[in-house]
Amino acid sequence: TGTEAGLSTRTIAKIAKGEKLSTHSLNRIAGYLNVAPELLCRKEADNKILQILRDEKEIQLSGGLYHELQVRMTYNSNHMEGSKLSEDQTRLIFETNTINMGDGIPVDDILETVHHFRAIDYCIDIAEEKLTEEIIKKLLYMLKHDTKDTAFPWFAVGDYKKRANVVGGRETSKPSEVARDMRALLERYNARDNVTIEDIIEFHAEFEYIHPFQDGNGRVGRLIALKECLKNNIIPFIIEDSKKSFYYRGLSEWRREKGWLVDTCLDGQDTFVKLLDILEIPHE
């Protein structure tokens, strides 16, 4: 009981009401239960959306924000890159971990869908951490491991590209330049005190200009944007497959006209806001 643990009636009343306790009281309870104090409490995120995602992820709540973010972002991000899975099929995989193989879906599309679910989990788990090369490489590895790409030694799953590539006819950083360019990009970005959604969009565009990986750059870039929005208490954006022509135009024209990509990402933020409204989650 509370008195056996050496707690005052006032402290017991606080526990009953779910109010905050002092460190001294927590240590007393932990000592009585013979457990570490940190096992009795958890740190809550300042970002309400991030905390909701973590709470729902922990209990695998169906039909909430976490559930819908997983399905909608995974479907749209993968479909933009050529996945043949429909949104309904993506939802089925998330909800039941099964799919009708009679649909003729490539195995890699299924694998990369499951991997994308785990990559979103990772972004939610480490949202507050400083963005690093290691985090970015891990996101690529999470997406591409065990796919057919791992059969090619030059593909370098989980590492920077070994072969030069072009995107939409546009030159990207050469393999010998990628590490230098990524370090410079991260140094500039992490030096900012108050990150805005425009800063995150700029990072996203410059990341795509570097195109550091052999494949998976777009999905990794959009996952980074999710993580950084959650870190900086900014409503995330989901680029819908139906808007991909505007999105790709915005990326290709970024260094000449920034407004196209910014407008497309803000439209994606409106998509997320609509989801918050449907679920009656307050937002600013």
Regions found by a protein language model. Give the residues of each.
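Recognition helix of helix-turn-helix/homeodomain-like DNA-binding domains
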Residues: G6-L21
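FIC/Doc superfamily catalytic core
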Residues: R42-E284
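DNA major-groove recognition helix of helix-turn-helix/homeodomain DNA-binding modules
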Residues: H24-L39
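Short alpha-helical "recognition helix" segments of helix-turn-helix
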Residues: T1-T3
